[in-house]
A protein has these predicted regions:
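Active-site neighborhood of HAD-like aspartate-dependent phosphohydrolases
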Residues: 1-42
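Asp-based, Mg2+/Mn2+-dependent phosphohydrolase catalytic module
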Residues: 1-4, 66, 99, 115, ...
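Conserved phosphate-coupling serine/threonine residues in phosphotransfer and NTP-handling enzymes
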Residues: 13, 111-113
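Short beta->alpha linker loops
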Residues: 20, 51, 89-93, 113, ...
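Alpha-helical substrate-recognition element adjacent to the catalytic core
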Residues: 23, 31-63, 69, 92
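Metal-dependent phosphoesterase signature
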Residues: 57-95, 99
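Short active-site oxyanion
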Residues: 104-109, 158-160
């Protein structure tokens, strides 16, 4: 069946903020009083696509729940400070490609990121007008599959395709019962039995 719409993931699919996020996390760790661990871009890439609190929990598996919540707040504040000042790096051809695709399909955006982060991407990239609707974990507190389903329902989409770069994106598409296209320039590894671009 021919797709009637395209739903995009954000990080690793449309842009890369691993370098400024790593610097932000190191700033947040310093403010939190942790100087023994330095975060790299590779650390950030390894958890990109997970909800923010889960990203922190994966990188700091031994931290108490109480300290985890405080650390999440500290890292989020530092990340917001740096990302709002610097933005990220759009992948080559993304802006032009989205404009061209938007002339053929309704475009949507679903990410596991914080609400402010998605809003800032849309403002910073000047691509807000390209997307008809968008949703994030930070806005709903719900997993990516639920947010894909919400976009599908509220926009009356019959045959959307979710486009992402990780196995988590693929699994979310499966749960939401939508087709999936894997982009191989992001942070994930190839996914079997899907179209890879």
């Amino acid at each position: 069946m021919k797709p009637d719409s395209l739903i995009f993931d954000l990080d690793g699919t449309l842009w890369d903020t691993t370098e400024p996020c790593a610097r932000a996390w190191n700033l947040g760790l310093e403010r939190f009083g942790i100087s023994s661990r330095k975060i790299t871009s590779a650390d950030i890439a390894s958890v990109t696509g997970l909800p923010y609190d889960k990203c922190v929990a994966v990188i700091f598996p031994d931290i108490s729940q109480h300290d985890l919540l405080r650390l999440v707040d500290q890292l989020n504040a530092a990340e917001k400070e740096i990302i709002l000042a610097e933005g990220g790096r759009l992948y080559d051809g993304v802006a032009k490609g989205l404009v061209e695709l938007g002339q053929r399909f309704p475009l949507f955006l679903v990410s596991n990121c914080q609400a402010w982060y998605l809003d800032w991407f849309l403002a910073w990239s000047k691509l807000k007008s390209v997307f008809q609707d968008y949703e994030s974990y930070g806005n709903t507190g719900k997993p990516k599959a639920d947010n894909i389903t919400a976009i599908k329902k509220r926009n009356r989409l019959f045959c959307p395709v979710y486009i992402g770069d990780t196995v988590n994106d693929y699994e979310a598409a499966l749960k939401a019962e939508v087709a999936f296209i894997h982009l191989d320039h992001g942070f994930g590894s190839p996914v079997d039995a899907v179209l890879s671009l």
